[in-house]
UniProtKB/Swiss-Prot annotation:
Protein name per UniProt: 8-amino-7-oxononanoate synthase
EC number: 2.3.1.47
Source species: Methylobacillus flagellatus (strain ATCC 51484 / DSM 6875 / VKM B-1610 / KT)
Intrachain disulfide bonds: none
Binding site for pyridoxal 5'-phosphate: 118-119, 189, 217, 245
């Protein structure tokens, strides 16, 4: 430890930061990391304990799939560990190109552009498309990256109440902006519900706006073939700008934007988070390719996940705590206070089950919750074990 290091000497800035951290601790908002040993999966090892995990967004159980591991290993042998340059210099390798083409075919969309992360993709898309003369209309429960991107773009930001189509239409009707962009999570990451995408698209068509969808939690899971929210609703429109990630259902890392080729070409030329960063390692792209292939062909995983979701909701008998309305793999249980949510999470941990307590500012004040993430790698027995413990804790 380096507590005596000169960098640890007190300064006004460090004193102020320490005071803010103390306030967070007092309010039950201080976050901590846990070190996971071994692979991500249904069972994980933390501090020597084997825990049943309902934490990860590995919705199809592909993060530790042998096909992804083999693809990553084989690619690393021929490409090395890192790319050493941005995509537009010399970092765009054959694995990246192959993945973009595979995603074009899989999604049935002509243009695809890879990004390092979903956060970077959202920053890149919104700041490239919107500026001071434009307006962004954002759901109040959107992911932080969408909010940050809107602020960074310097466009006029109008936020509407969650899934409030009437409020959104009023804002669109009043706007005189040069370009109007409606932005929404396709699946809301902390509530698990879906955006009313067909109705959003209808409003965009009526008011000459465009619709950007962050389908991080729908890609690979929704739709008969896992093509996400667009397949789920049967939508195809040049007004839709589609973003999805490769680090959740696909089991690897990264993200992509899909839509018209003019859109992706424009983003390649202008999106600063794409231009000014080192390309992600080619082995990661190879693993993502293997994940996309499994999404396309292994329908049994999605079917099993849907059965687990139905089983969980049918068997949940919570009364004091609120199971939110969600038909996705994200099943939030609202506890209310920060302190009680953290305490319930700790009690679950004592019973060998890992479920995160989600608190403000990630969720609205007074709605601290357990965010239960189901995976196709879980069994019905795993789900029943979780529910049995939750029911006992609520009654205690």
């Amino acid at each position: 430890m380096l507590e005596s290091h000169p960098a640890e000497a007190a300064t006004p800035l460090l004193d102020a930061l320490q005071a803010e951290l103390a306030d967070r601790a007092r309010l039950g908002l201080l976050r901590q990391r846990r070190v996971l040993h071994g692979m991500q999966g249904v069972y994980v090892e933390i501090e020597g304990k084997r825990l049943l995990s309902f934490c990860s967004n590995d919705y199809l159980g592909l993060a530790s799939h042998p096909s992804l591991i083999s693809a990553m290993r084989d690619c690393a042998v021929t490409t090395g560990a890192g790319t050493g340059a941005s995509h537009l210099v010399s970092g765009h390798q054959q694995a990246h190109e192959a993945l973009e083409h595979a995603l074009q075919t899989f999604m049935g969309l002509p243009g695809v552009l890879l990004f390092t992360t979903g956060y970077m993709a959202n920053l890149g898309i919104i700041t490239a498309l919107c500026g001071r003369q434009d307006a962004i209309f954002a759901d109040k429960l959107n992911h932080a990256s969408l909010n940050d991107a809107a602020l960074l773009s310097r466009a006029e930001l109008k936020r509407y109440a969650h899934n409030d189509l009437t409020g959104l239409e009023r804002l669109l009707a009043q706007s005189q902006a040069r370009r109007k962009l409606v932005v929404a999570d396709a699946v809301f990451s902390m509530d698990g519900d879906l955006a009313p995408v067909p109705a959003l698209l209808s409003l965009c068509e009526r008011y000459d706006a465009y619709l950007m969808l962050d389908d991080a939690h729908g890609f690979g899971v929704l739709g008969a073939h896992g093509r996400g929210v667009l397949e789920h609703f049967g939508l195809d429109s040049p007004r839709i700008i589609y973003m999805a990630t490769l680090g959740k259902a696909a089991g690897a890392a990264g993200a992509f934007v899909a839509g018209p080729t003019i859109l992706t070409e424009y983003l390649m030329q202008t999106a600063r988070p794409y231009i000014y960063t080192t390309a992600s390692p080619a082995p990661v792209a190879a693993a993502a390719m293997a994940g996309v292939q499994l999404i396309e062909h292994d329908h049994a995983r999605r079917a099993h996940l849907r059965a687990l979701i139905a089983d969980f909701r049918a068997s949940c008998r919570l009364q004091r705590w609120q199971l939110m309305a969600s038909e996705t793999a994200i099943q939030p249980v609202v506890i209310g206070s920060n302190e009680e949510a953290v305490q319930v999470s700790k009690r679950l941990l004592e019973h060998g089950v890992l479920v995160p307590a989600i608190r403000p500012p990630t969720v609205p004040r007074g709605t601290a919750r357990l965010r239960i993430s189901l995976s196709a790698a879980h069994t019905h027995e795993d789900v029943q074990r979780l529910l049995d413990i939750l029911h006992r804790l609520e009654e205690a």
